[in-house]
Structures are given as structure tokens and as C-alpha cells.
Amino acid sequence: MYERIRFTEYLDLDLNDEHWYCHDCGTKLISARESYKKGCLVAERRPHEIHNPVIEGEYSFAPDENWVRILEFYCPGCTRQIETEYLPPGHPITVDIEVDIDSLKARLKKGVIVIKDGKLTKPEAEVLA
């Protein structure tokens, strides 16, 4: 049995059932062999809702919605915002985390790395050396 690994501020990986979880509420999002974003609620925001114009006129220093779209990814359990993405219109959602689960499990089994307090680290003997 493995302890959950804290991958980001709001995202945990459980190697026992190979799923992504919300760190805040523990909601199971999706298989860790897929992008965690597929297990999230997604909100598309218009740039002017988030970035108020700095000056009046055409060149306001606010992003142009013809050039950028903003996607926000939320936990379906507690609605914690997990990630935000700025993409060109029509661009597919990016895959920003791809874990080689089989390799990670093999390294943990061999003792090359260990999970301590939710973090991947080297075994104590190597840390002290």
C-alpha cells in the first residue's frame, strides 16, 4: 500500500487505485493514466471578465478574446480551482502532467525512491550521505 503523493497544491496521486484526487476534499477525479483535467469541471472565461482594461481604447493591455481563451478547471466535489489555462482559440486542452505509473511503482518497489509525508524523496540513508 502506498501513501498518496501530493503532485501539486490541489492534486494528489494515489498509486493504489491509480487515480487523481482533489487534495482539499478527497474527491476521486479520474484514472491517473489520463489527464486529471478530464475529471474536472471546466469553465471557459472571457478575458475581459478577468483582466480589466488598463487604459481606454483599442490597445487596453487586456487580452484579446480573438487571440486567447481562458479555461479554469475545478474539483467536482468542492469546486476548488485546480488549474487555469490560457490557450489560443481552437487549441486543444494541454496535457501538463503525464506520469509513468509503472516505472514509478517499480522504483518505489526497488527502494530507489520512497514516499514520505506525501512527497517523493530518496531513502533516508541517501539523504544523510
Swiss-Prot record:
NCBIfam families: AcphenoCarb_ApcB
Cofactor note (record): Divalent metal cations. Magnesium or manganese are required for activity.
Gene (UniProt): apc2
EC number: 6.4.1.8
Keywords, in A-Z order: ATP-binding, Cytoplasm, Ligase, Nucleotide-binding
The protein's name: Acetophenone carboxylase beta subunit
A Pfam family per the record: Acetone_carb_G
GO MF entry, a single one: ATP binding
Catalysed reaction equations from the record: acetophenone + hydrogencarbonate + 2 ATP + H2O = 3-oxo-3-phenylpropanoate + 2 ADP + 2 phosphate + 2 H(+)
GO cellular component: cytoplasm
Notes on activation and inhibition: Inhibited by zinc ions, carbamoylphosphate and beta,gamma-imido-ATP.
Subunit-structure text: Acetophenone carboxylase consists of five subunits; a heterooctameric subcomplex of two alpha (Apc1), two beta (Apc2), two gamma (Apc3) and two delta (Apc4) subunits assembles with the epsilon (Apc5) subunit in an unknown stoichiometry.
Function recorded in the entry: Catalyzes the carboxylation of acetophenone to form 3-oxo-3-phenylpropanoate (benzoylacetate) in the anaerobic catabolism of ethylbenzene. Also carboxylates propiophenone at the same rate and 4-acetyl-pyridine at lower rates.
Keyword ATP-binding found: yes
Domain of life (superkingdom): Bacteria
Cofactor(s) in the UniProt record: Mg(2+); Mn(2+)
Enzyme's top EC category: ligase
Subcellular localization(s) per the UniProt record: Cytoplasm
